[in-house]
Amino acid sequence: MSKFLFTAAAIVFLSCAPAQAADKPENFLPPDALDLTAILPPPPANDSPVTRAELAEIHRVQAGASAAQNAQAKADTQEDAYVFASVLGANFTAGKLPAAAPFLEHVREAEKEFVDPAKKALGRPRPPLVDSTIATCETLRPSGAYPSGHATTGYLFAVVLAQIVPEKREQIFSRAAEYANNRVLCGVHYPSDVEAGKISGSLIGAMLLQNPAFKAELGPAKAEIRRVLGLPSQ
């Protein structure tokens, strides 16, 4: 899947380049810059062998989880950049980043812009709506399951934060994977939802890296984050 993820990112990056220039003030990218329903494989049908196998996998993951893993999955219902504080340090908080915090929220809006329409169009019900014996670590959200918004957000922020703190690139992506996979443990996503989210976040991140408005905001945000984290300027 990782090979497909980066191959897909490269393909979509090239195909979407012209649309990226049409930046909108409220978002880095225009709504028509990316149609995830045209890129992602369709989700498995509710009564398919794949879905049945995924439901069994959710049960297996939940049965084997420790108390600490369950607590982390619960904590990871939070959906913002600061879930990476475990990698970047205790100073990585909105309160200590007055300049970077709005930038990071601006980045997160890109996930909503592209994932929300895809969820609505694809309409995959969340696992407990198909198998009521699956427990969840949060109140079930009304949005569709595919692709996972949390997984998209995690990988989108991983792409961006790896540009800001390249020294911790490996740890950042490891944390993104943990964060994304915890949606399965939480019982609110199938594994294929999470994989689709990883692809989506990587695609959106690749597009942002080429966006002029994003790059204009990245510089000051990077400078502040590195200063607050006690890292040398770049």
Language-model segment annotations:
Residues 1-6:
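Bacterial N-terminal signal peptides that target proteins for export
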Residues 22-185, 217:
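Hydrophobic alpha-helical bundle signature of multipass membrane enzymes
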Residues 123-128, 156-158, 194-202, 222-225:
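Short alpha-helical linear motifs
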Residues 17-21:
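Sec/Tat signal peptide C-region and signal peptidase I cleavage site
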Residues 7-15:
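Bacterial N-terminal signal peptides
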Residues 178-209, 213-216:
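Interfacial helix-loop-helix junctions of multi-pass membrane proteins
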Residues 138, 165, 207-209, 226:
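A short hydrophobic/aromatic micro-motif that marks alpha-helical segments and, especially, helix-coil
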Residues 210-234:
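Acidic, carboxylate-rich catalytic segments that either coordinate divalent cations
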